[in-house]
């Protein structure tokens, strides 16, 4: 029992440190964000030394003014809306129709792409690199040749004549979700052949981007040679002389936030290179560059790339993966426990489809998890009962061999063998629950399906902390308590259920451990307060089920129940003596 208590204590303290560290650092030591300032026009190096225009803005542009520029081609698809700027053929205006900025009914849709020069600029464009050939650039004014609105049924085509015998073309198509197909053509009508390289670029600012942490990646992302690369963040690109040439063959490359992503996907079967580059102050580029192609006189070449710009919905990403976008489903960083997290997400979403509420789905998921763990819990209680039964023998051995530790260990091992006791059996449920807890934590943190999903009463968003804070009288006072001081109703219920759970257990032999386990529920109440309401709901439900499970198992092992009642009586007598003293 003492070893088990020590392990529990170590696990709980480790959880508190791991889960609480990032919250404290985010709250009290936020990264400094600098507003964009005027910069000089510059270029940066791409793969093989190709120049990437930095597209440096003059001053920060007003978003509405930028979107009011003439000639924009509207985008109207089932999941996204926006427009394409014919200047530079930039896809620079995308909002996500089905995802809102907040739970408020009048909140607007999430803006993913914004025009060049605006505070949150984020856009994509497709061009060519060539020596001795006039190629389109960021300032090229393209002509619309077909289509006046990009929809799922109607693609849009643009062209540009460089005046030297080459005609460049772009055709945009869009599907029912978040994928644009971009076809680049080049017709050579001049005398002699030319050599060019097709290219796609995503340019975005890091201002306002989600913060990359030890357990959630935000920033540059790429799939290379059968793996998804989460190694780089924005600052590391800057520290690497502003340039990262990615090794291997890219399946896709782009930028990710917690819920959103933009990515370039090359035409299958063609050799490409990928890189990340600093493209100005607080601005970065993801570049996809095809190998050089020679276009003979009178010939045309065609390249078809894809641009993903949307929400990281697991079903959608996996559907694209099934269509040939390798490892696209792994763009959601489920972490070390992906083998548990994804099945848990799958089960949670299917339970939601059955019950119609993600809070109820979490409760159902918790019941299923506890039911699966119940046989192990039975073995744990049986082990605890056996350990209690041999405790007098253990104490006798400890007294007899107190000066001979090797002999004591041998005799204890013999006692365990003779009594058929495994002292580690009681720890197994704890170790099994750690990956389950972290997997659910990742699911609630990363699954966009949970975003803005309500429960009942005051819980309007299960992916956000409990809004009913005690220190501001549940919202009556006009301030938001900081971090771990923002104790909500769910955190208090969590502390109470955990306290009851510890109270039902037989007391630890060590008085210091007894004190630690008395205060541990309230420590965890503060630590868990800033976490998602859905995670607290899971833990509360698990605690309540554990209380019922303990009651049942105590009926099967009356010696443990008697010991727990004796310990409780001893604690009450000790508390009474302390008060009198």
Predicted feature locations:
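Soluble non-transmembrane domains of integral membrane proteins
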Residues: 72, 76-328
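Intrinsic disorder/low-complexity detector
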Residues: 8, 24, 57-60, 190, ...
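Helix-loop-helix
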Residues: 1-38, 84, 184, 196-223, ...
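Intrinsic-disorder/low-complexity loop/linker signature
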Residues: 48-49, 148, 475
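Intrinsic low-complexity, intrinsically disordered segments enriched in polar/basic residues
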Residues: 38-45, 128, 143, 260, ...
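Aromatic/His-enriched, Gly/Pro-containing loop or helix-boundary segments
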Residues: 3-5, 42, 65, 145-148, ...
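Juxtamembrane extramembrane loops of integral membrane proteins
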Residues: 23-113, 570-571, 575-581
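Generic structural signal for short, solvent-exposed loop/turn connectors between secondary structure elements
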Residues: 53-57, 152-156, 166-167, 507-511
